[in-house]
A protein has these predicted regions:
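Amphipathic alpha-helical substructures
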Residues: 366-368, 403-470
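Extended, low-hydrophobicity, Ser/Thr/Pro/Gly-biased non-transmembrane segments
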Residues: 137-234, 240
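Juxtacatalytic substrate-recognition/specificity segment
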Residues: 194, 242-343
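A surface-exposed beta-strand-loop module
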Residues: 90-155, 219
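Post-HExxH zinc-binding segment in Zn-dependent metallohydrolases
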Residues: 273, 277, 306-313, 343-387, ...
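Surface-exposed beta-strand/loop patches in extracellular or lumenal glycoproteins
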Residues: 70-92, 179-184, 188-199, 446
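N-terminal, polar/Ser/Thr-rich
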Residues: 8-64
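Zn2+-dependent metallopeptidase catalytic core
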Residues: 74, 190-203, 225-230, 258-289, ...
C-alpha cells in the first residue's frame, strides 16, 4: 500500500485550504443579496423626497404602483402646476400612464401634453416656500428594444423611465424634446425610497442599496431599496441570470448579468474601477453601485444614479476603461449634474480624463503615451462637420459615435493638455474643487474655469473657449 509522504500531505492540506477559501469566496458572492444597514431618510431641508411602491410582472413587460413626492418650492416664485417627465412615452407613446393625482390629499387634474406625451402636468397652486405632498398612480409598459429604457425577453433596463419632476430653470419648466444622446437623468437631487414586489424568479437591482427583503409567501417577494441624492430612478431586472456582490472601500457593489461568470467578471472590473478612481483622490459619491449587463446602443454604456449599464462582450482592458468612465460619470454628471443638452462635455470629458489618469497610474507612462497619441489625441485632428465641436449642443451631433469621438476623445485630449502643463496634482486638485463646490447641484463652464484657476493659479478661460469652439 502506498503511503503519503510529508510533501504529499502538505500539498493535500494546501489544496483543502484553497478549496475552503474558494467556497467562502463563492458564498460571499452568492445570490442572496447583501443588505445595507441604513435608517429611513429624515426630512432634508435642501432635498425633496420620493417614496415609490411598485409591482413588476414576471415577463418584465409591466410595472405599476404608486409614487409619492414631498417637494418644496424653492424657486422664489408661485406656480400653477407641477411638471413631470415620463421619458418612456417619448420612446414609445402610451408606455406611461399617470392617474389619480392628489396634492396634499386633494384630487388634482393630471394630463400629458398632446404634442409631447413625455410631459405630464399636475394642475395645482404651489406657492414659494410651500411644501407639497404629491402622489399619483403609474402604469409603465416597458418599451421593447435596446437603450437606457427598454426590455428584451430576459431583461429590462429602466434609467429614468418612471416620472420625476422636470427641471425649473430661468423662470420656466424644462420640457426639451427627448434626445437619445442626452439620457434621462436630468433632475434635482432627491432622496428615493422604493419597495418593489417581484415574482420569486425575477432578479432586481436598483440604483441604490437594498435595505430590506420580505418573502410574501405567494410566489413573490418585496424588496426595499433607497438612495440619497438620486437624480432619477434607475432599475435593472432579469428573469434569468445571476447576481454577485462585493464591497470596495465601503461601497457595496452589485453586478446583475445573464450568468454567474459574467456577473463575477463585471463585479471584478467594477471593483478595479472604483479602486483606481479612489487612488486618484476622487470619491465615489454613493454607498452603493449597481452594474447591469445590457446593450444600451451607446459606445460606453448608460448611466443612472448609482447604476451603470454596460455591454459585457468587450475584452477586459476595453471593458475596464468603459466601466471606469461610467463610474467617473457618477461624479461628473450625477453628483455634479450639468445641462445634458447644451453642456454634455462637462460629464463625459472629465470622466474620460479620470480614466486616462487611472490608466497611466496602472500601466505606466510609456503605455499611456502610446494609447494617448494612438487613440485619443488623433481625434483633435479629424475633420468634422461644421458646428460639431466639444462645446456644441447635442442637436449638432449625428449619432453617439460622433459625439463620443468629440466629447470623450477630443475633449479629453484638450483637458489633458492642461494636466500636462500644470501637473497631475494641480489638475486633480481642480477636479476635486469643482466637485466639492458643486456637489448636489449643477456644474457650469464658469464653475469649471473657477476651479481650474483656484487650483492652478492660472486663467484657463481662453484655452477652454478655443477648445470648445474648435
Amino acid at each position: 500500500m502506498k503511503v503519503f509522504s510529508r510533501k504529499n500531505a502538505l500539498l493535500l492540506a494546501a489544496l483543502l485550504i484553497a478549496l475552503a477559501a474558494a467556497c467562502a469566496f463563492a458564498l460571499s458572492r452568492a445570490q442572496t443579496a447583501v443588505m445595507l444597514e441604513e435608517t429611513a431618510f429624515a426630512p432634508d431641508a435642501e432635498r425633496d423626497a420620493m417614496t415609490v411602491s411598485l409591482e413588476a410582472t414576471e415577463d418584465l413587460r409591466t410595472i405599476k404602483g404608486e409614487m409619492r413626492l414631498t417637494a418644496t418650492n424653492r424657486t422664489g416664485g408661485d406656480f400653477s402646476e407641477i411638471v413631470l417627465r415620463a421619458y418612456a412615452n417619448a420612446i414609445q407613446p402610451g408606455s406611461v400612464t399617470l392617474s389619480d393625482a392628489k396634492v396634499n390629499g386633494e384630487r388634482a387634474s393630471i394630463g400629458a401634453d398632446s404634442d409631447d406625451p413625455s410631459v405630464w402636468r399636475i394642475e395645482t397652486p404651489w406657492r414659494a416656500g410651500e411644501t407639497a405632498e404629491v402622489c399619483w398612480r403609474v402604469s409603465l409598459i416597458v418599451p421593447r428594444g435596446e437603450g437606457a429604457i427598454g426590455r428584451t425577453d430576459e431583461s429590462a433596463l429602466l434609467i429614468g423611465a418612471l416620472p420625476t419632476p422636470a427641471m425649473w430653470e430661468n423662470g420656466a419648466w424644462r420640457t426639451d424634446g427627448y434626445d437619445e444622446l442626452v439620457g434621462t437623468s436630468y433632475g434635482q437631487a432627491m432622496d428615493v425610497r422604493m419597495t418593489l414586489t417581484v415574482p420569486n424568479g425575477v432578479q432586481a437591482a436598483f440604483g441604490g442599496a437594498w435595505v430590506g427583503a420580505r418573502d410574501n409567501g405567494d410566489g413573490t417577494r418585496t424588496l426595499t431599496m433607497q438612495l440619497s441624492g438620486a437624480r432619477e430612478i434607475s432599475l435593472a431586472l432579469r428573469t434569468k441570470g445571476a447576481m454577485r456582490q462585493t464591497t470596495v472601500d465601503g461601497v457595496l457593489v452589485t453586478a446583475l448579468a445573464q450568468n454567474a461568470r459574467t456577473a463575477s467578471r463585471l463585479l471584478d472590473i467594477a471593483a478595479d474601477a472604483l479602486e483606481d478612481i479612489g487612488q486618484l483622490g476622487l470619491a465615489y459619491p454613493f454607498p452603493s453601485l449597481t452594474v447591469a449587463q445590457a446593450k444600451t446602443a451607446r459606445a460606453d454604456g448608460a448611466v443612472g444614479s448609482a447604476l451603470i449599464a454596460v455591454d459585457a462582450d468587450a475584452k477586459t482592458d476595453a471593458l475596464l476603461s468603459r466601466v471606469t468612465r461610467l463610474c467617473a460619470r457618477q461624479i461628473f454628471g450625477v453628483q455634479v449634474e450639468n445641462d445634458p443638452w447644451n453642456a454634455p462635455w462637462l460629464s463625459e470629458t472629465p470622466a474620460s480624463c479620470v480614466e486616462l489618469l487611472a490608466y497611466r497610474r496602472r500601466e505606466g507612462e510609456a503605455a499611456y503615451e502610446k494609447r494617448f497619441y494612438g487613440e485619443i489625441e488623433i481625434a483633435t485632428r479629424l475633420t468634422r462637420p461644421r458646428g460639431v465641436t466639444i462645446g456644441a449642443s447635442t442637436e449638432r451631433f449625428g449619432g453617439d459615435g460622433e459625439m463620443t469621438q468629440v466629447l470623450r476623445d477630443a475633449g479629453a485630449a484638450g483637458l489633458m493638455g492642461i494636466e500636462q502643463a500644470v501637473g497631475q496634482a494641480a489638475f486633480l486638485g481642480a477636479l476635486q474643487r469643482y466637485v466639492e463646490q458643486n456637489a448636489g447641484g449643477f456644474g457650469t463652464l464658469e464653475a469649471f474655469e473657477a476651479a481650474l484657476e483656484q487650483a492652478t493659479g492660472s486663467d484657463w478661460s481662453g484655452y477652454l473657449a478655443d477648445m470648445l469652439a474648435s
